[in-house]
Structures are given as C-alpha cells and as structure tokens.
Design a protein with these regions (language model features):
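Alpha/beta enzyme core
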Residues: 24-38, 85-98, 119-120
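Structural motif corresponding to the early beta-alpha repeats
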Residues: 59-85, 90
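Active-site mouth loops of central-metabolism enzymes
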Residues: 7-22, 72-82, 103-111
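Single conserved hydrophobic/aromatic residue that forms the stacking wall/gate
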Residues: 122-130
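An N-terminal, well-structured beta->alpha segment
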Residues: 18-21, 25, 51-53
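Glycine-rich, proline-tolerant flexible connector loops at the mouths of alpha/beta enzymes
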Residues: 35-61, 76-81, 101-114
Length: 130
C-alpha cells in the first residue's frame, strides 16, 4: 500500500536534452528529505514532450538512482493503447513498482473504449495500477 508524500517529479532539461545529472540531484535530495515514493514521467514530468527513448531512459534512471529505497511509480499512459502497453512493460522490466496509466486525454474514448484500453494494458502486463 502506498502512503505518505509521493511527489510527481519534474524532468529537468538543458539545451533541449534531458538533464540526467540535475534529475539525479533532485531525486536524491527528495529522498534525503523523506519522500515516501516518486512518480516519474507523469505529465508534471513532461511525459508528452519526451521521446520514447528519453521516457524509457528516465524510468530506468529513476529506478537506479532511487536505489530501491522508495517505490517508483512510472507514468506509462498514452492516447495509444499500443504505446501504453509498451511503456508499461518497459517500466516493470526496468524495476518500477507501479505504472501510472492516465486515461486517453486527446481521443476521449467512450466507457467501453476506456475499459478496453485499460484491460488490454493490464492483460499485457499484470499491473499494480495506481
């Protein structure tokens, strides 16, 4: 069960690239200050502006930097079911503890479409949804 302070961490950029050094400093500082977990690659973390490679690298990096001291919630949602499945599988393979799957916000499926979207993600990777 998740409890406590679990911030949605920002993704620092420098000269148009993800600034992994600044991200590591920020995450280490937040861990030192007592966070209970972290959410990476959510919309606060610039998920829609990251390339697929950056997204996947950032999840891997957050798991590594956290040193398994706190749970890592990886943003894995997408308007595309196929992409959300890919991100979710990668997050768990990388060691993330939870996947954060937002509802498709651009194409806005009806209730059946939403259930199908989430069900296909869960079937592909038995998730611990958050």
């Amino acid at each position: 069960m998740l409890k406590g302070s679990i911030p949605a961490i920002i993704t620092p950029f420098s000269k148009g690239e993800v600034d992994f050094d600044s991200f590591a400093k920020l995450l280490k500082w937040q861990i030192k200050e007592g966070i209970s977990g972290v959410t990476v690659c959510g919309t606060t973390g610039e998920s829609p502006t990251l390339t697929h490679d950056e997204h996947m690298q950032l999840v891997e990096f957050a798991v590594k930097v956290s040193g398994r001291k706190i749970p890592v919630i990886a943003g894995t949602g997408s308007n595309s079911t196929k992409e959300a499945i890919e991100f979710t599988k990668h997050a768990y393979k990388s060691g993330a503890d939870y996947g954060l799957v937002v509802t498709p916000y651009y194409n806005k499926p009806n209730q059946k479409g939403l259930v199908d979207h989430l069900s296909l993600i869960h079937i592909s990777e038995p998730t611990r949804p958050y």
